[in-house]
Design a protein with these regions (language model features):
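Helix-rich effector regions associated with P-loop NTPase G domains
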Residues: 1-12, 16-18, 23-25, 32-43, ...
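Short amphipathic alpha-helical segments
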Residues: 25-28, 56-59, 110, 158-161
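Short, contiguous clusters of charged residues that form electrostatic/catalytic patches at enzyme active sites
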Residues: 25-29, 80-83
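Canonical P-loop GTPase G-domain recognition
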Residues: 50-103
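Walker A/P-loop
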Residues: 101, 105-107, 111
């Protein structure tokens, strides 16, 4: 079933992690599908930088593969890169977190908002368990509206009848 992710956003943050499941092709698909038809800037947040030695390398790979992409290595657990990520929005902005299950979106919400969004353990294979099942908005401590979204299983492009001509 097709479901629009969110509307009226000012910034889209695609959250990923730098582990063995990291895929530039997935990042490209997310950027293309989620940012298509959207004037909001996109930032790739390579979360869990505290778990590997090459998180910044992954961010650089993404910047190289996707011209114009803003990418930053962060750790919601240790706070690495969080101050830099916060510079991407202003008070009153609507900021959307999107990405696969288990990449730390809800943990990032907790850091940015000082709230207690439910988080979960990873399965034995390192994948998330889809703890977030609905979109939910929070207010960051600097006054932005932060929307936490469920883990994406797949993304794609679609258009309303008659709108294909504007996309191509």
């Amino acid at each position: 079933e097709r479901q629009p992710l969110v509307a009226n956003l000012d910034l889209l943050i695609i959250v990923t992690d730098p582990t063995g499941d990291f895929s530039i092709r997935r990042v490209e698909r997310y950027v293309e599908a989620l940012a298509s038809g959207c004037d909001a800037p996109v930032v790739l947040a390579v979360n869990k930088a505290d778990t590997v030695d090459d998180a910044e390398t992954r961010a650089a790979e993404a910047r190289s593969a996707i011209p114009g992409l803003d990418a930053v290595a962060i750790s919601a657990r240790t706070g690495t890169g969080i101050a830099e990520l916060r510079t991407r929005w202003s008070p009153g902005d609507t900021v959307v977190l999107a990405g696969s299950s288990g990449v730390g979106k809800s943990t990032l919400v907790n850091v940015l908002c000082g709230t207690a969004a439910e988080t979960g353990d990873l399965r034995g294979d390192g994948r998330g368990m889809h703890k977030t099942t609905t979109r939910r908005a929070y207010v960051t401590d600097d006054g932005a509206l932060l929307v936490d979204t469920p883990g994406l299983r797949e993304v794609g492009l679609y258009s309303e009848e008659g709108s294909a001509g504007t996309a191509f």
